[in-house]
Amino acid sequence: MATTRLTLAPLLLIAAVLLATKATAQPAAPAPEPAGPINLTAILEKGGQFTTFIHLLNITQVGSQVNIQVNSSSEGMTVFAPTDNAFQNLKPGTLNQLSPDDQVKLILYHVSPKYYSMDDLLSVSNPVRTQASGRDNGVYGLNFTGQTNQINVSTGYVETRISNSLRQQRPLAVYVVDMVLLPGEMFGEHKLSPIAPAPKSKSGGVTDDSGSTKKAASPSDKSGSGEKKVGLGFGLGLIVLCLKFLF
Protein backbone atom coordinates (compact mmCIF):
# COMPACT_ATOMS: atom_id res chain seq x y z
CA MET A 1 0.00 0.00 0.00
CA ALA A 2 2.78 2.38 0.92
CA THR A 3 4.57 1.45 -2.28
CA THR A 4 1.50 2.35 -4.35
CA ARG A 5 1.28 5.75 -2.73
CA LEU A 6 4.93 6.42 -3.40
CA THR A 7 4.42 5.50 -7.05
CA LEU A 8 1.38 7.76 -7.48
CA ALA A 9 2.96 10.79 -5.84
CA PRO A 10 5.39 11.58 -8.68
CA LEU A 11 2.63 11.03 -11.22
CA LEU A 12 0.34 13.49 -9.46
CA LEU A 13 3.16 16.00 -9.24
CA ILE A 14 3.85 15.70 -12.97
CA ALA A 15 0.15 16.12 -13.78
CA ALA A 16 -0.05 19.27 -11.65
CA VAL A 17 2.98 20.74 -13.41
CA LEU A 18 1.49 19.96 -16.82
CA LEU A 19 -1.83 21.61 -15.91
CA ALA A 20 -0.06 24.71 -14.63
CA THR A 21 2.03 24.92 -17.77
CA LYS A 22 -1.07 24.60 -19.97
CA ALA A 23 -2.86 27.34 -18.05
CA THR A 24 0.15 29.62 -18.38
CA ALA A 25 0.39 28.94 -22.10
CA GLN A 26 -3.18 30.10 -22.80
CA PRO A 27 -3.01 32.76 -25.56
CA ALA A 28 -3.55 36.33 -24.34
CA ALA A 29 -6.59 38.26 -25.54
CA PRO A 30 -5.83 40.04 -28.84
CA ALA A 31 -4.92 43.70 -28.46
CA PRO A 32 -7.48 46.13 -29.87
CA GLU A 33 -6.71 47.19 -33.40
CA PRO A 34 -5.45 50.75 -33.72
CA ALA A 35 -8.08 53.26 -34.80
CA GLY A 36 -8.01 54.24 -38.46
CA PRO A 37 -6.94 57.68 -39.65
CA ILE A 38 -9.25 60.59 -38.84
CA ASN A 39 -11.52 61.55 -41.72
CA LEU A 40 -13.26 64.94 -41.60
CA THR A 41 -15.82 64.03 -44.27
CA ALA A 42 -16.91 60.93 -42.34
CA ILE A 43 -17.40 63.02 -39.19
CA LEU A 44 -19.54 65.55 -41.07
CA GLU A 45 -21.56 62.85 -42.83
CA LYS A 46 -22.37 61.34 -39.46
CA GLY A 47 -23.64 64.77 -38.36
CA GLY A 48 -26.15 64.67 -41.21
CA GLN A 49 -26.63 68.37 -42.05
CA PHE A 50 -23.45 69.41 -43.83
CA THR A 51 -23.96 68.46 -47.49
CA THR A 52 -22.98 71.86 -48.88
CA PHE A 53 -19.91 72.19 -46.66
CA ILE A 54 -18.77 68.68 -47.61
CA HIS A 55 -19.20 69.55 -51.30
CA LEU A 56 -17.08 72.69 -50.91
CA LEU A 57 -14.44 70.80 -48.94
CA ASN A 58 -14.19 68.34 -51.82
CA ILE A 59 -14.10 70.74 -54.78
CA THR A 60 -11.55 72.99 -53.07
CA GLN A 61 -9.56 69.95 -51.82
CA VAL A 62 -9.42 71.55 -48.38
CA GLY A 63 -10.94 68.38 -46.91
CA SER A 64 -8.00 66.29 -48.13
CA GLN A 65 -5.52 68.84 -46.77
CA VAL A 66 -7.19 68.73 -43.35
CA ASN A 67 -7.12 64.91 -43.27
CA ILE A 68 -3.42 64.84 -44.13
CA GLN A 69 -2.44 67.54 -41.67
CA VAL A 70 -4.57 66.35 -38.76
CA ASN A 71 -3.06 62.86 -39.00
CA SER A 72 0.51 64.13 -39.15
CA SER A 73 0.63 67.37 -37.15
CA SER A 74 1.28 67.58 -33.42
CA GLU A 75 -0.66 70.85 -33.20
CA GLY A 76 -3.94 69.35 -34.35
CA MET A 77 -6.70 71.31 -36.08
CA THR A 78 -10.07 72.95 -35.41
CA VAL A 79 -12.87 73.11 -37.98
CA PHE A 80 -15.97 75.31 -37.82
CA ALA A 81 -18.69 73.63 -39.88
CA PRO A 82 -21.64 75.69 -41.18
CA THR A 83 -24.90 73.78 -41.53
CA ASP A 84 -26.87 73.50 -44.75
CA ASN A 85 -29.32 76.05 -43.34
CA ALA A 86 -26.42 78.45 -42.84
CA PHE A 87 -25.58 78.28 -46.55
CA GLN A 88 -29.25 78.62 -47.53
CA ASN A 89 -29.47 81.83 -45.51
CA LEU A 90 -26.70 83.48 -47.52
CA LYS A 91 -27.63 86.29 -49.87
CA PRO A 92 -28.41 84.76 -53.31
CA GLY A 93 -25.33 84.59 -55.51
CA THR A 94 -22.84 84.98 -52.65
CA LEU A 95 -20.93 81.80 -53.49
CA ASN A 96 -21.33 82.04 -57.27
CA GLN A 97 -19.71 85.47 -57.40
CA LEU A 98 -16.53 84.12 -55.81
CA SER A 99 -13.59 83.11 -57.95
CA PRO A 100 -12.17 79.59 -57.41
CA ASP A 101 -9.32 81.10 -55.36
CA ASP A 102 -11.75 83.02 -53.16
CA GLN A 103 -13.82 79.87 -52.62
CA VAL A 104 -10.69 78.17 -51.32
CA LYS A 105 -10.02 81.13 -49.01
CA LEU A 106 -13.57 81.02 -47.70
CA ILE A 107 -13.33 77.33 -46.76
CA LEU A 108 -9.82 77.71 -45.32
CA TYR A 109 -11.25 80.49 -43.16
CA HIS A 110 -13.30 77.81 -41.37
CA VAL A 111 -10.13 75.90 -40.41
CA SER A 112 -7.63 76.75 -37.68
CA PRO A 113 -4.20 75.05 -37.74
CA LYS A 114 -4.39 74.21 -34.03
CA TYR A 115 -6.60 72.14 -31.76
CA TYR A 116 -8.88 74.20 -29.50
CA SER A 117 -11.24 72.78 -26.90
CA MET A 118 -14.30 74.79 -25.88
CA ASP A 119 -12.45 75.92 -22.76
CA ASP A 120 -9.51 77.01 -24.91
CA LEU A 121 -11.77 79.19 -27.04
CA LEU A 122 -13.07 80.97 -23.94
CA SER A 123 -9.59 82.03 -22.88
CA VAL A 124 -7.72 82.26 -26.18
CA SER A 125 -6.06 85.50 -27.28
CA ASN A 126 -7.93 87.09 -30.17
CA PRO A 127 -7.72 87.01 -33.11
CA VAL A 128 -7.33 83.27 -33.63
CA ARG A 129 -5.38 82.38 -36.73
CA THR A 130 -7.05 80.49 -39.59
CA GLN A 131 -5.65 78.79 -42.68
CA ALA A 132 -6.83 81.63 -44.93
CA SER A 133 -4.63 84.55 -45.94
CA GLY A 134 -4.75 87.52 -48.30
CA ARG A 135 -2.62 88.55 -51.26
CA ASP A 136 -0.18 90.29 -48.93
CA ASN A 137 0.07 87.04 -46.91
CA GLY A 138 -1.86 88.66 -44.08
CA VAL A 139 -3.59 85.93 -42.07
CA TYR A 140 -7.37 86.11 -41.65
CA GLY A 141 -8.42 85.71 -38.01
CA LEU A 142 -11.48 84.91 -35.87
CA ASN A 143 -12.53 86.46 -32.57
CA PHE A 144 -14.17 84.49 -29.75
CA THR A 145 -16.23 85.75 -26.82
CA GLY A 146 -18.77 84.24 -24.48
CA GLN A 147 -19.36 82.28 -21.32
CA THR A 148 -19.29 78.64 -20.31
CA ASN A 149 -22.66 77.79 -21.87
CA GLN A 150 -22.25 79.84 -25.07
CA ILE A 151 -19.35 80.85 -27.27
CA ASN A 152 -19.72 83.43 -30.04
CA VAL A 153 -17.42 83.70 -33.03
CA SER A 154 -17.01 86.93 -35.00
CA THR A 155 -15.36 87.59 -38.35
CA GLY A 156 -15.67 91.35 -38.16
CA TYR A 157 -18.43 91.06 -40.75
CA VAL A 158 -20.76 88.44 -39.25
CA GLU A 159 -21.16 87.03 -35.75
CA THR A 160 -22.73 83.72 -34.73
CA ARG A 161 -22.55 81.11 -32.01
CA ILE A 162 -21.03 77.67 -31.73
CA SER A 163 -24.17 75.57 -31.36
CA ASN A 164 -22.71 72.09 -30.99
CA SER A 165 -19.61 69.92 -31.12
CA LEU A 166 -19.27 67.01 -33.55
CA ARG A 167 -15.86 66.07 -32.19
CA GLN A 168 -13.79 67.48 -29.36
CA GLN A 169 -10.85 65.15 -28.98
CA ARG A 170 -7.24 65.68 -29.94
CA PRO A 171 -6.01 66.09 -32.57
CA LEU A 172 -9.25 67.36 -34.18
CA ALA A 173 -12.15 69.49 -32.97
CA VAL A 174 -15.20 70.04 -35.18
CA TYR A 175 -17.73 72.68 -34.08
CA VAL A 176 -21.12 73.49 -35.61
CA VAL A 177 -21.84 77.13 -36.47
CA ASP A 178 -25.21 78.59 -37.46
CA MET A 179 -23.83 81.01 -40.07
CA VAL A 180 -21.22 80.85 -42.81
CA LEU A 181 -18.14 82.67 -41.55
CA LEU A 182 -17.66 85.42 -44.12
CA PRO A 183 -14.28 87.13 -43.57
CA GLY A 184 -14.37 90.90 -43.31
CA GLU A 185 -11.25 91.02 -45.49
CA MET A 186 -13.34 89.65 -48.38
CA PHE A 187 -16.87 90.88 -47.66
CA GLY A 188 -16.40 93.99 -45.50
CA GLU A 189 -17.53 97.48 -46.47
CA HIS A 190 -14.01 98.54 -47.37
CA LYS A 191 -14.20 96.05 -50.25
CA LEU A 192 -17.20 97.77 -51.85
CA SER A 193 -16.48 100.00 -54.85
CA PRO A 194 -16.98 103.70 -53.96
CA ILE A 195 -19.57 105.69 -55.91
CA ALA A 196 -17.79 107.63 -58.65
CA PRO A 197 -18.30 111.44 -58.53
CA ALA A 198 -20.23 113.05 -61.38
CA PRO A 199 -17.83 114.01 -64.20
CA LYS A 200 -17.11 117.70 -64.63
CA SER A 201 -18.07 119.33 -67.91
CA LYS A 202 -15.05 120.20 -70.06
CA SER A 203 -16.76 123.39 -71.20
CA GLY A 204 -17.05 124.64 -67.65
CA GLY A 205 -20.84 124.52 -67.92
CA VAL A 206 -23.34 124.01 -65.12
CA THR A 207 -25.34 120.80 -65.04
CA ASP A 208 -29.03 121.13 -64.24
CA ASP A 209 -31.28 118.53 -62.57
CA SER A 210 -32.22 116.98 -65.90
CA GLY A 211 -28.58 116.18 -66.60
CA SER A 212 -28.15 118.66 -69.45
CA THR A 213 -25.28 121.06 -69.38
CA LYS A 214 -25.85 124.79 -69.60
CA LYS A 215 -22.90 126.87 -70.68
CA ALA A 216 -22.12 129.65 -68.25
CA ALA A 217 -21.79 133.09 -69.82
CA SER A 218 -18.24 134.40 -69.66
CA PRO A 219 -17.35 138.06 -69.00
CA SER A 220 -16.11 138.39 -72.59
CA ASP A 221 -19.49 137.22 -73.88
CA LYS A 222 -21.27 139.84 -71.77
CA SER A 223 -18.97 142.69 -72.87
CA GLY A 224 -19.27 141.68 -76.51
CA SER A 225 -23.06 141.87 -76.30
CA GLY A 226 -22.86 145.40 -74.83
CA GLU A 227 -20.54 146.60 -77.58
CA LYS A 228 -22.96 145.37 -80.25
CA LYS A 229 -25.82 147.34 -78.67
CA VAL A 230 -23.76 150.60 -78.56
CA GLY A 231 -22.64 150.24 -82.18
CA LEU A 232 -26.20 149.71 -83.38
CA GLY A 233 -27.47 152.88 -81.60
CA PHE A 234 -24.66 155.01 -83.03
CA GLY A 235 -25.43 153.85 -86.60
CA LEU A 236 -29.13 154.70 -86.28
CA GLY A 237 -28.22 158.24 -85.09
CA LEU A 238 -26.09 158.88 -88.18
CA ILE A 239 -28.91 157.78 -90.49
CA VAL A 240 -31.36 160.22 -88.82
CA LEU A 241 -28.91 163.17 -89.26
CA CYS A 242 -28.39 162.39 -92.94
CA LEU A 243 -32.14 162.35 -93.57
CA LYS A 244 -32.49 165.83 -91.96
CA PHE A 245 -29.88 167.30 -94.32
CA LEU A 246 -31.51 165.77 -97.35
CA PHE A 247 -34.99 167.05 -96.53
Swiss-Prot record:
<comment type="similarity">
    <text>Belongs to the fasciclin-like AGP family.</text>
</comment>
<dbReference type="InterPro" id="IPR000782">
    <property type="entry name" value="FAS1_domain"/>
</dbReference>
<feature type="glycosylation site" description="N-linked (GlcNAc...) asparagine">
    <location>
        <position position="58"/>
    </location>
</feature>
<dbReference type="GO" id="GO:0005886">
    <property type="term" value="C:plasma membrane"/>
</dbReference>
<dbReference type="GO" id="GO:0099503">
    <property type="term" value="C:secretory vesicle"/>
</dbReference>
<dbReference type="GO" id="GO:0098552">
    <property type="term" value="C:side of membrane"/>
</dbReference>
<feature type="propeptide" description="Removed in mature form">
    <location>
        <begin position="225"/>
        <end position="247"/>
    </location>
</feature>
<dbReference type="Pfam" id="PF02469">
    <property type="entry name" value="Fasciclin"/>
</dbReference>
<feature type="glycosylation site" description="N-linked (GlcNAc...) asparagine">
    <location>
        <position position="39"/>
    </location>
</feature>
<feature type="lipid moiety-binding region" description="GPI-anchor amidated glycine">
    <location>
        <position position="224"/>
    </location>
</feature>
<feature type="glycosylation site" description="N-linked (GlcNAc...) asparagine">
    <location>
        <position position="152"/>
    </location>
</feature>
<keyword id="KW-0325">Glycoprotein</keyword>
<comment type="function">
    <text>May be a cell surface adhesion protein.</text>
</comment>
<keyword id="KW-0654">Proteoglycan</keyword>
<dbReference type="InterPro" id="IPR036378">
    <property type="entry name" value="FAS1_dom_sf"/>
</dbReference>
<protein>
    <recommendedName>
        <fullName>Fasciclin-like arabinogalactan protein 9</fullName>
    </recommendedName>
</protein>
<dbReference type="InterPro" id="IPR045003">
    <property type="entry name" value="FLA_A"/>
</dbReference>
<keyword id="KW-0732">Signal</keyword>
<feature type="glycosylation site" description="N-linked (GlcNAc...) asparagine">
    <location>
        <position position="143"/>
    </location>
</feature>
<feature type="signal peptide">
    <location>
        <begin position="1"/>
        <end position="25"/>
    </location>
</feature>
<feature type="domain" description="FAS1">
    <location>
        <begin position="37"/>
        <end position="181"/>
    </location>
</feature>
<keyword id="KW-0449">Lipoprotein</keyword>
<feature type="glycosylation site" description="N-linked (GlcNAc...) asparagine">
    <location>
        <position position="71"/>
    </location>
</feature>
<dbReference type="GO" id="GO:0005576">
    <property type="term" value="C:extracellular region"/>
</dbReference>
<feature type="compositionally biased region" description="Polar residues">
    <location>
        <begin position="209"/>
        <end position="223"/>
    </location>
</feature>
<feature type="region of interest" description="Disordered">
    <location>
        <begin position="193"/>
        <end position="228"/>
    </location>
</feature>
<keyword id="KW-1003">Cell membrane</keyword>
<keyword id="KW-0336">GPI-anchor</keyword>
<keyword id="KW-0472">Membrane</keyword>
